Amino acid sequence: MALFTDSGTEAKAPHIRASGSRGSDLDVERDRADELAREFYSTPRASSQILSDGGGPFGFDIHAAFIFDEVQSRLDADAIIETGTCLGDTTDYLSRVYPDLPILSVEIDGNRAEFARLRLRDRSNVEVVRGDSATVLEATAHRFSRPIFYLDAHWADDWPLRRELDTVRQGVAVVDDFDVGHDRFGFDSYGGVDCNAGRIKESLPGCAIWIPDVGFRHRYPCLQVGRRAGRAYVAIGQRAKDTLSSIPMLMSHD
């Protein structure tokens, strides 16, 4: 299967939106949150023995799933590109929630890539690729006009984040393990360099960065009692900036 061909793919994920009264809007928002929660908590945590957060979609942080859904809907994304598949927990979740969106996931470890490929072999919208994430992004990212990048390949000795960001030209990049300035959320540091706004803007000087508003009241609590990862939501281009600025779950980090 080759979803990411040179001809590209134009797809839209179904996302319920209501018109009419605010009451109707609230009902739809509630139903969507319930739908996401069912998919989120039914996803097997295959990475539970590997990752410090116990695995699961988005490190078992359902608030990250809610924010991602808002980004996807408001951006009208035409692809999801994930780096750092591991065993496919997040990929599994995304493939079920957005069955009409092409999803590319990149993993450098051969055994993990093969596990994820077998796990997701029945998902026609998913392609798992073994390889260097920045190299794969360079070859594929330009084929889409409104992609969401989920960059989570920055845990090994080789930190590919800078090279990944150098390939991003449009859309929204979600950077995992980012320093959001809150004690509850962890972040990565390699060779004395923290995963922070300065690191991102070295590669994307014209970008704008948002982070989660920790005071936002979500419909469901986050059940991750261990390590929670901070995340940056990076807008490249005016459409992406307009998208992120419209999401009440986020706050500007600039």
Question: What are the residue ranges of the model-derived segments?
Answer:
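A short alpha-helical cap/connector motif
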Residues: 1-148, 153-254
